[in-house]
Swiss-Prot record:
Highest taxon, organism lineage: Bacteria
Protein name: Probable glycerol uptake facilitator protein
Main location (coarse class): membrane
Location relative to the cell: Cell membrane
Domain remark text: Aquaporins contain two tandem repeats each containing three membrane-spanning domains and a pore-forming loop with the signature motif Asn-Pro-Ala (NPA).
Listed SUPFAM superfamilies: Aquaporin-like (SSF81338)
UniProt catalytic activity: glycerol(in) = glycerol(out)
Span(s) of short sequence motif NPA 2: 206-208
GO cellular component terms given for this protein: plasma membrane
GO terms classed as biological process: glycerol transmembrane transport
Gene from which the chain derives: glpF
Membrane protein topology class: Multi-pass membrane protein
UniProt keyword annotations, A-Z: Cell membrane, Membrane, Repeat, Transmembrane, Transmembrane helix, Transport
Family of this protein: Belongs to the MIP/aquaporin (TC 1.A.8) family.
Length: 258
């Protein structure tokens, strides 16, 4: 996450916006397909597995597309961007790291919100025939049992695994550059995290993916809706906390972050 001029920052913004757009289109699109009424796929078996794998596919093609626009992009997640920003400041500080972080965050939120708005437009007939809580699930996450401590730790640990996996995958790709395309291991990493943790909290592991789409839900004209704002801070603060903690731990380790 190093930038030499404002032009690179502009391409970084576009890459993160489009990459995050693709992530949400795939992920929340899959949730809509298996949950909204009047969808031909709403009776699909293995809904949870379908959604988990489709989120993974969203990561794969979001990262691939972002990297095609600007090499080194494809975070699609403020927690990952925070990790790389802090780690970069510790090991190789440059003037544009933090402006790049802010621009990336804005792009990720905007990409998520545009994607969710697009899904709502495309599926409006099905959405308007479905109960508000099910519609909420195609926007953002909610816990199966509300418990602040356990919900926070679930999202925190899941995000630690996500970012740690991203770092490990980056090292593998650096040492084996022609092995698999960028984002391929992210597909299985994200799918695995959702399968392991998603039943408890929905596995947001991404503030833009959760808060940006929750805002869209709040702005959508649906009767008797509840965006569950009392929970909304957990999928934001827990992933960012994981990014902060891991960046400090790895930042002072001798191993380079690629």
């Amino acid at each position: 996450m190093y930038f030499q001029n404002s032009t690179q920052l502009g391409w970084w913004f576009l890459a993160e916006l489009i990459g995050t757009f693709i992530l949400i289109i795939f992920g929340n699109g899959a949730v809509a397909q298996v949950n909204l009424k009047k969808m031909a796929t709403s009776e699909t078996k293995a809904k949870f597995l379908t959604v988990a794998l489709t989120w993974g596919i969203g990561v794969l093609f979001g990262v691939l597309t972002a990297n095609a626009i600007f090499k080194g992009s494809g975070h699609l997640n403020p927690a990952i961007s925070l990790f790389y920003a802090i780690n970069g400041s510790i090991k190789s500080p440059t003037a544009l790291i933090w402006p790049g972080f802010v621009i990336g965050i804005l792009a990720q939120f905007l990409g998520a919100m545009i994607a969710q708005t697009t899904l709502n437009f495309l599926f409006w007939k099905q959405l308007s025939s479905t109960d508000p809580q099910t519609v909420l699930a195609m926007h953002c996450t909610s816990p199966s049992v509300f418990n602040i401590t356990r919900n926070f730790l679930t999202e925190f640990i899941a995000t630690l695994i996500l970012i740690g996996g991203v770092v490990a995958a980056s090292h593998f790709l650096h040492n084996n550059p022609n092995s698999v395309p960028p984002g391929f291991m992210g597909l299985w990493l994200v799918a695995g995290i959702i399968i392991a943790f998603g039943g408890a909290t929905g596995s947001a592991i991404n503030p833009a993916r959760d808060l940006g789409t929750r805002i869209v839900f709040q702005l959508t004209p649906i009767k008797n809706k509840d965006a569950n704002w009392k929970y909304s801070w957990i999928p934001v603060i827990a992933p960012l906390s994981a990014g902060l903690v891991l960046s400090i731990i790895i930042g002072f380790s001798p191993a380079p972050v690629l």
